[in-house]
Amino acid sequence: MMEFFKTADVVVIGGCIVGTAILRELSKYDLKCVLVEKEPDLAAGTTKANSAILHAGFDAPTGSLKAVTNVRGNKLYHELQKELGLDIEWTGSLVAAT
């Protein structure tokens, strides 16, 4: 088993949303990739315990890196839903201005 790690081009540590997204993107290239996860299943840590909200970017300062990446990330989820046939329920949200 250890020999496999020695010959890998990339080792991704963590099998939650970020690690698996990185691994998926790397799979598009001619690379030997390995995913290492301490839990018995994927997405068993932070990803499993999150609030399942995809932030639209409205709460970050206009033009900030956070706003730009929130909008881009939200768009990517819509693209991934179509590409992978994900069962995502888009419920929307309500924001109260104070």
Task: Report residues per predicted region.
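Glycine-rich FAD pyrophosphate-binding loop
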Residues: 27-49
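Dinucleotide-binding Rossmann-like beta1-alpha1 core, especially the glycine-rich loop
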Residues: 52-98
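N-terminal Rossmann-like FAD-binding beta1-loop-alpha1 element of flavoenzymes
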Residues: 5-35
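A structure-centric signal for secondary-structure junctions around beta-strands
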Residues: 7, 30, 48, 90-91
